[in-house]
Amino acid sequence: MQDDPRYRVEVEVSPRFLAHQSTPDEGRYAFAYSIRIQNAGAVPARLVARHWQITDGNGRTEQVDGEGVVGEQPWLRPGEAFHYTSGVLLETEQGQMQGHYDMVADDGTEFIAPIAAFVLSVPRTLH
């Protein structure tokens, strides 16, 4: 059902570095990411699960799977959006995340909402 326009969810991500929660000397780099999930289809749908692939700057990859997001399984009418913020710790100054959400439409159709890869990076300071 991925190509059926009735079942379409758009995902926008805004990552940021959390300097105050990071300890670079210990290899701990904290990042937050704010996500906007919008039902761009024609059928109400519920986000039931998340699947993330997190890769650090050394190429180490971790898979994270779970029910819903931030303790919720949001139900979205057509045009409706859900926002949340979460975070991740890396051992390197940069990395990336990508993944998808498992969705179930009110008519029972299961489909995937892809999350394009986005970069997590410590901003550089110019001197």
UniProtKB/Swiss-Prot annotation:
GO biological process entries = error-free translesion synthesis
**One Pfam match, by short name?**
DUF525
Task: Show the coiled coil region(s).
Answer: none
Under the heading PROSITE patterns, the entry gives: APAG (PS51087)
User: Can you tell which superkingdom this protein's organism belongs to?
Assistant: Bacteria
Note the Gene3D superfamilies from the entry: ApaG domain (2.60.40.1470)
Q: Where is the ApaG domain?
A: 3-127
Q: Which InterPro entries match?
A: ApaG_domain, ApaG_sf, Uncharacterised_ApaG
Q: Which PANTHER family does the entry mention? A: F-BOX ONLY PROTEIN 3 (PTHR14289), POLYMERASE DELTA-INTERACTING PROTEIN 2 (PTHR14289:SF16)
The family database entries (HAMAP family) matched by this protein are listed as: ApaG (MF_00791)
What is this protein identified as?
A: Protein ApaG
Q: Which organism is it from?
A: Xanthomonas axonopodis pv. citri (strain 306)
